[in-house]
Amino acid sequence: MSSIRVRQILADVMAGEEDGLPERLCRACAVAIPVTGVGLALMTPAGHGGSITTTDGAAAVMEDLQQTLGEGPCMDASRDGRPVLQSDLAVTGMSRWPSFTACALEAGIAAVFAFPLQVGAIRLGLLNLYRHTTGSLDRHQLAEALAFAEAATTMLLRLQDKRPSGQPLHPRLAEAVGSRREIHQATGMITVQAAVGLAEALLLLQAHAYSSERPLIDVAKDVVARRLRFAPEDDHHE
């Protein structure tokens, strides 16, 4: 991997406020490859730590589905420590990740490319790319994706180095972990309330967030606080 290209990416995305680093890196990646959307996720020793940022709603759906269902290209990439490149989910995905693939296709996601962020055996996170259309990454696009993954790894390490004294995680990373827990709890509650599976429960949560033009985490907090309830064979009522 060209260290010159990685340094160039870091120089470009770090020319701004620290809090916006993850967003700038993902947006730059989506333009450079190009792909429809990009997501950056945190990994912890216990597993998926949560989504740090995504470039768009479909990328957020992809991240949330894999976190909730515990399956998908991104989960495999983190577990195995190597990229997982799925150029046509409809052809290859159903046999490996049936629940994730069915929901991803419904959301318009046709191809997924997942890159682990790690230092040696230590898992830090994932850089996840997706397209609305099928097709592989060409040689140049793959090299770009690997460069952005290396840059994202460096960025996460620098954020951790700047965490407040006495805190285990930088605030941006701690926020991802907290959001992950609340979304997971809300999804579990909806499975009971609406008598549906995990995948459908997450889609109900996302549909409500979309229709009400609110962040997913805010809707999840309402479910956990019992301000919002989903009824069987019905949309929802508050």
Q: Model segments located where?
A:
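Intrinsically disordered, low-complexity terminal regulatory regions
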Residues: 1-69, 221-238
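Signal-transducing coiled-coil/dimerization helices and immediately adjacent hinge/linker segments
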Residues: 161-238
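Allosteric cytosolic regulatory segments
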Residues: 142-153
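Interdomain signal-transducing alpha-helical coiled-coil linkers
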Residues: 3-6, 15, 138-142, 157-170, ...
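Short hydrophobic beta-strand micro-motif common in sensory/regulatory domains
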Residues: 111-118
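Short beta-strand-to-loop transition segments that serve as allosteric relay/switch motifs
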Residues: 89, 126-135, 140
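Regulatory sensory and allosteric helical modules in signal-transduction proteins
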Residues: 43, 59-96, 102-110
